[in-house]
């Protein structure tokens, strides 16, 4: 998550380099670690080909929002600037590499996913090497993530959709097995249900089918997915087979030889990167680092499970 200026524009250093992502990352790492949450970061790899259309659409929307932001800026309309700025967030390859370096400087593991980060993180949780995935992307459940935690937000608030106001939020634990039991379906049926409604690989889903109808159809057809998607008129909505999307969720590339190693905070590296290179306040950065040291002295970190008992 990035931190922005009052008008919604990105924070930059004296050389004009964007620093919002680094400020947001530092603040989040510091805050969550001080709440006894042991973090590891998984980064996206190569997106599946079927996701390219969704990514292109997102890119177009951000370009359009940027144009509207510039028009609002010309009129000095701060409210509109904030509104459209929130829709323009884009991470360049350079920004992502900087984020990885900062995470490593804080002594936290960086795992590179071959493809989708949610899929890789799901494997790590399934293997018992982490408590849960901190994500607001429910697609992680389609990759069989046993637990996800939504709204892991340091401020305890988030922006309301298409509004300038905020709402108070709390961490929300979602357990896959409990939800499958509640819905009365299995894992493969959950994937089929999501495909009817729409995923990153078949954006928009099947026209005219909402969550309630999708659940009813999935229960009616059981595991006869050929019949299900024929009834749903998949070929009339997409120019690729339903199996292409289904197989992505079932067989997406994952790195089984990942390594989770936590190290000491490299204060010199953090100071060099944030203070020397990007003009961060030395006092503020030192304060964040000292907060981490205090947490470490108080005892062993216990993990996200402490939030939920």
Q: In which residue ranges do the predicted regions lie?
A:
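Charged, glycine/proline-rich intrinsically disordered loops and linkers
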Residues: 68-82, 160-177
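Hydrophobic/aromatic ligand-binding patch that stacks against planar heteroaromatic rings
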Residues: 31, 123-124, 140, 193, ...
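Residue-level marker for buried hydrophobic side chains located in beta-strands
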Residues: 133-134
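Noncatalytic, basic helical substrate-engagement surface that gates or grips nucleic-acid strands
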Residues: 1-127, 146, 154
């Amino acid at each position: 998550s990035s931190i922005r200026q009052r008008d919604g524009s990105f924070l930059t250093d004296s050389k004009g380099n964007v620093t919002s992502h680094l400020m947001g990352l530092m603040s989040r790492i510091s805050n969550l670690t001080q709440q006894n949450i042991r973090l590891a970061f998984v980064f996206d790899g190569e997106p599946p080909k079927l996701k390219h259309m969704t990514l292109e659409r997102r890119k177009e929307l951000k370009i359009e929002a940027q144009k509207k932001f510039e028009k609002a800026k010309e009129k000095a309309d701060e409210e509109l600037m904030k509104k459209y700025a929130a829709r323009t967030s884009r991470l360049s390859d350079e920004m992502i590499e900087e984020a990885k370096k900062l995470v490593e400087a804080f002594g936290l593991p960086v795992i590179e996913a071959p493809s989708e980060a949610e899929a890789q993180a799901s494997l790590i949780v399934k293997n018992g090497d982490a408590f849960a995935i901190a994500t607001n992307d429910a697609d992680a459940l389609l990759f069989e993530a046993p637990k996800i935690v939504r709204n892991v937000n340091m401020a305890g608030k988030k922006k309301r959709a298409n509004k300038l106001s905020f709402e108070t939020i709390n961490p929300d634990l979602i357990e896959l097995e409990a939800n499958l039991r509640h819905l009365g379906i299995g894992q493969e049926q959950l994937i089929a249900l999501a495909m009817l409604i729409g995923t990153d690989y078949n954006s928009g889903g099947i026209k005219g089918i909402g969550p309630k109808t999708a659940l009813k159809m999935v229960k009616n057809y059981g595991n006869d997915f050929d019949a299900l998607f024929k009834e749903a008129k998949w070929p009339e909505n997409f120019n690729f087979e339903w199996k292409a999307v289904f197989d992505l969720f079932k067989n997406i590339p994952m790195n089984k030889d990942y390594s989770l190693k936590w190290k000491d905070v490299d204060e010199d590296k953090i100071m060099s990167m944030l203070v020397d290179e990007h003009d961060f306040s030395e006092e503020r950065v030192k304060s964040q680092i000292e907060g981490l040291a205090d947490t470490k002295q108080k005892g062993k970190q216990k993990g996200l499970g402490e939030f939920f008992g």
